[in-house]
Amino acid sequence: MRTADWIKKKAHEVVYNAGTNNPMKICEENGIYVCHQNLGRAFLGHYTNIKRIPLITLSAQNNEFEDNYACGHELGHHYCHHGNNTEWLSRNNLRFNTMGSEYEANLFMVNIMLEGVDFSEFETKEQLFKSCGIPLWAERYVDFN
């Protein structure tokens, strides 16, 4: 299990090296393939490796907002080295995880998407999250200190 500090440092490193905190652009900069498939409405995305080639599959039914955070979540699986045995990100499992690979992936997602953002520029958490493309259910993963 990775620590929250390790994940935050890794997210900073990834954003710094890619020159962006946009999950889709991070994939592009790092040779991580992203494709869209018909996964139905229940699933948002999945991460896997095919012959050591990283691949993020996003649902063709996702909107742009869902693609963005699902991609960030799946990047968490890639950079936290979870391998191929991760859960599919589903609309039904967007609950708060306190440990394990889903917790780490969610923590990584919010850390890359908030990297370099000055929280004081926003009056409410909702404004901050909307501006950064983070879903409200992910608030519990954000360290506001």
Q: What residues fall within each predicted segment?
A:
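Active-site hotspot residues in diverse enzymes, especially metal/ion-binding acidic/histidine motifs
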Residues: 1-145
